[in-house]
Structure formats: structure tokens, C-alpha cells
């Protein structure tokens, strides 16, 4: 399954473009722009599994740095600062990674 099976390619392109500048990433606005906020909980979990590149059941800090590439292969990497900010927002239990429930909460709070 690919991201465009779940989200509009046009919405993804617009959202990636909106955060093309370094240190401009805002996960709340991004999740809204790609249409993730409007998706069912099941679809949000499918997106999580696409972003969980190593299939560990978690999105670790190194995977978070490449989160935009999970939506579009030509997107930029997040900066270290953006990655830490995203991790802090999503890692509710403080284990240094984001699980599927934490990701679902992160999306629903956006």
C-alpha cells in the first residue's frame, strides 16, 4: 500500500510544498493539509505502518527525520530541531519513539 492509496496526491504535493523551507515544518498544519486529520482511525493506522519503515511497530527518531519522504520521495528531510519537536509532541510515554496509538493521538490533536 502506498500513501496515495490513502491520501490525495494533490494534497500531499501542496503540503510538501508548504513546508519546503528548512525549519518550517508544523505537524498539525501538515496533517491537516494532507487530509490525514479527516481519515478514519483505521486509515491513520495504515499511514503509521507506511511511515514505520523498519516495521518495528514504532516510528523512531531516525525515521521521524524522514517523515516527509514517507509522503513523497522527493520531499526534504526534517532538521534535527524539527525532528526533536515532532518526537516531543508525539512521544507521550517518554520512551523515545512514537507507537501507533501515540501517532493516532498526534493526528487527532492536530
UniProtKB/Swiss-Prot annotation:
The modification Phosphoserine is found at residues 2, 8, 24. CDD domains: EFh_parvalbumin_alpha. Pfam families: EF-hand_7. Ca(2+) 1 binds at residues 52, 54, 56, 58, 60, 63. PROSITE patterns: EF_HAND_1, EF_HAND_2. Disulfide bonds: none annotated. PANTHER family: PARVALBUMIN ALPHA. Belongs to the parvalbumin family. In muscle, parvalbumin is thought to be involved in relaxation after contraction. It binds two calcium ions. This is Parvalbumin alpha. It comes from Gerbillus sp. The gene is PVALB.
